[in-house]
């Protein structure tokens, strides 16, 4: 039973073979399949060959071409020098170019031109025979012409003649190029061979024959033309014409080689002549560029300047007076600025020697020094400061021979800011600290000044300068970590060493720092180990107020930081007590009290 499909037929092509076709079409299908297989095999072979060719080109041919290009570039760079050399030596310009070869065969062109010339000559010969007035000489000439015409195709393939190539604008070459006669040679009559019988007539005819050279001599001028050309206007025109003729010089062409379809040629042309205006302009520019730069006048050497012995210089020289006046004016201005208080950072310490006589001696003896010595010795800048101790003023030079001990005594004693020890467990009321107050420092300064006045009458009292807060904040040499007292007075600005400020988390309103010196910490540790409290005795003989201040600095009432007794540790750590110092014990106490 045969079944039929209900589905609609689709328009798509099916590649399946229908088994219901007759067996007569099977050979044709096999042939088609065989052809398809052959085409696929051929295409695969083509792809394989293309891939091989690409690998050969990329791996072998391309590197060789690149190497050849590199080497030829070197050759081109070297030949560039010789090209420039020959151009400059011959005063010419060399240009290389490529010209395509014409499609018309030069041999056929020569044959065509020769046939045209033959037809013209035959027509002339027939006219001469019809008139019956042609001599034997003319017949011989015609025969010679015919012989020349027969020989011309053979000559065309040989080495070209120099005169013909000059007329055509070409130069002799040794390539396979076939020369073509120009249109000028077609229009002119062909050259005729003269007989040797009439020698003088042959010379005359050779002189009258047109040559192939470009530069022809102009005809001789008659008397009328000479009269006309004698005018100035005609002379100007004639000079201009001669200039143009000299400018339009002939160009020679050389064929270097012939490739498949092109000629590689080189043209040799003379350099263009520059116009007078342009030449003058370029000459001016070149003269400016090549000339040496305009320099100022050289300095005139004088006897006073540059001499090796400045001590023999006269003190009344104008140069020396002028320099001395300039220095005096500058020093006067600097002194006025310092007196007016224009210094921005007055709190910066003044760095000078103890005696101060070196600076003052330099300033006072400035006029006695020579110019060369004065230039090399400049005084240091003068800086005043209040917070860094007493400024010593040694204006009086009569007491320069004073003892160094007096100078040392005049210097201020630096104050030590101590480390804070705060007990977090204890209350703030139990804390006791010793801090240097501005009043104590003032008392110390007063006592030092009174001692200095008793020893040396020439020492001056220290002066205080009120400085703005803004300048103190901008001064990088000052320590801004200190706090002001409730009396709004500034504390000492000495550098604080090893300061560690402890902060209380509960109370943030504390304004006073609890500080102790290293000696106090050492004595407290020893006293805690022994179970005693340290007491210091005052050895100051003056009995002044500053002695009480020093005693108050040394006297401390301490409390154990941890709140626990440390008597048990006294046996182990008794070796660190001051009793083992021996003769250095009293010296250590003196150092700790100062």
UniProtKB/Swiss-Prot annotation:
The keyword Nucleus applies. One of its GO terms (cellular component) is DASH complex. Residues 313-326, 352-368, 393-403, 449-466 have a biased composition (Low complexity). Residues 122-152, 170-193, 226-249, 288-468, 480-594 are annotated as: Disordered. Disruption phenotype: Short, often misaligned spindles with an extensive network of cytoplasmic microtubules. Cell cycle arrest in mitosis with unseparated DNA. Inviable. Residues 327-350, 487-506 have a biased composition (Polar residues). Residues 141-152 have a biased composition (Acidic residues). It is found in: Chromosome, Centromere, Kinetochore; Cytoplasm, Cytoskeleton, Spindle; Nucleus. Residues 561-574 have a biased composition (Basic and acidic residues). Keywords: Cell cycle, Cell division, Centromere, Chromosome, Chromosome partition, Cytoplasm, Cytoskeleton, Kinetochore, Microtubule, Mitosis, Nucleus. Belongs to the DASH complex ASK1 family. PANTHER family: DASH COMPLEX SUBUNIT ASK1. This is DASH complex subunit ASK1.
